[in-house]
Amino acid sequence: MALDRGAVLLAELRLALAEEPNETAEALIDRADAQLDRARELAQAGRLRGSIRAATLGRALALEAHWLLSRGDAGARVERAIDAVGELLEDLAVELGPDAAAERAELETARAHWTEAAAAWKAGELVRAEQLCRLAEAAARRAAEEAGTP
């Protein structure tokens, strides 16, 4: 599911890129796509921890491209990012093993930031919501990086 959600986000970004060319965003999207491909390969090879790390990095790169390309409606941009980070957190919660205490602690930090981001968005505090969303994504990435190290 994590790879599917990553692919959906990349498809959305490629459509946005067609409307709003941006070399930096295109490079981020290409790197994200490569990471998702790597995640698929690692999953097929039975290397789940490495796959989690690669998929999360791919989605993080995609979110960076999202911030670059989504210059229109700020509320919609932040809302989509909050949704994407929420999906990332859901997937990580499922994929992290029961023995992953340190990773789960980072995941809880990410969830706390994400919850605050969603509340800030609902309150119309878009700058704060964006900052908290970025903090949530960074904590999720740290959890995945810890999961990827044996």
Feature map (PLM): residue ranges:
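Long, charged/polar, soluble alpha-helical segments
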Residues: 1-150
